[in-house]
């Protein structure tokens, strides 16, 4: 299955570790008690078994290393069916030279979000970014950076058809806690396959 060139690989139906399940339950608790309104705020807040978790990352151009893999990567965790999907897609050098890391992060996140909304309509989505600027922009659908406006417009177009059916909650996690998505964005897949 693909959306906008995004291809997902199914990692299979596997048990979540106790630590992963605890982390997801903590995220749900935080969402249920956070101040502010998520996208489609008239809908019920998500419960652990009634949502999908997306974790995004993008690796931009490394000045001292022009040869290593740089791309976008996302994990999709579905607690109800205990399925895990992953995607990773390399960025062409032209894109790496023209876009900064927050732009790449939002581009990757928007494509994965679009895929999840189409594939699992009506299921609450919890997105996790390790980039604070990407998180803030995605939550508000607005930014102060002209370079990110195209991603906000794309995201609005993606979300609009789901306004009455699907809530999307976007949160920030410390970079050190997002290492799984970081490994995908750098194509470090050996330990997952």
PLM features: residue spans?
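A short, polar/acidic, helix/strand-boundary loop motif
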Residues: 77-107, 115, 133, 138-150
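Two-metal-ion RNase H-like nuclease active-site motif
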Residues: 47-67
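Short, flexible loop/turn motifs enriched in small residues
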Residues: 63-72, 121
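Flexible, low-complexity interdomain linkers flanking nucleic-acid-processing modules
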Residues: 183-193
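Mobile genetic element proteins and their domesticated derivatives, centered on retroelements
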Residues: 1, 27, 57, 74, ...
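RNase H catalytic domain
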Residues: 113-179, 186
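Short, flexible loop/turn elements at secondary-structure junctions
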Residues: 57-62, 76-81, 91, 131-133, ...
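C-terminal reverse transcriptase regions that engage the nucleic-acid substrate
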Residues: 1-44
């Amino acid at each position: 299955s693909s959306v906008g060139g995004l291809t997902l690989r199914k990692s299979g139906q596997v048990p979540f570790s106790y630590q992963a399940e605890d982390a997801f339950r903590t995220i749900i608790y935080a969402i249920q008690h956070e101040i502010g309104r998520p996208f489609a705020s008239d809908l019920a807040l998500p419960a652990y078994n009634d949502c999908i978790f997306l974790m995004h990352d993008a690796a931009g151009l490394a000045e001292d290393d022009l040869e290593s893999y740089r791309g976008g990567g996302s994990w999709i965790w579905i607690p109800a069916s205990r399925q895990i999907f992953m995607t990773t897609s390399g960025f062409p050098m032209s894109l790496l030279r023209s876009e900064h890391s927050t732009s790449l992060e939002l581009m990757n996140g928007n494509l994965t979000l679009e895929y999840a909304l189409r594939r699992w309509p009506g299921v609450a989505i919890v997105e996790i970014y390790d980039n604070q600027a990407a998180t803030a922009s995605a939550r508000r659908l607005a930014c102060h950076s002209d370079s990110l406006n195209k991603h906000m417009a794309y995201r609005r177009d993606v979300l609009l058809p789901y306004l009455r059916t699907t809530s999307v909650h976007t949160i920030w996690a410390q970079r050190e806690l997002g290492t799984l998505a970081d490994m995908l964005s750098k194509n470090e897949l050996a330990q997952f396959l």
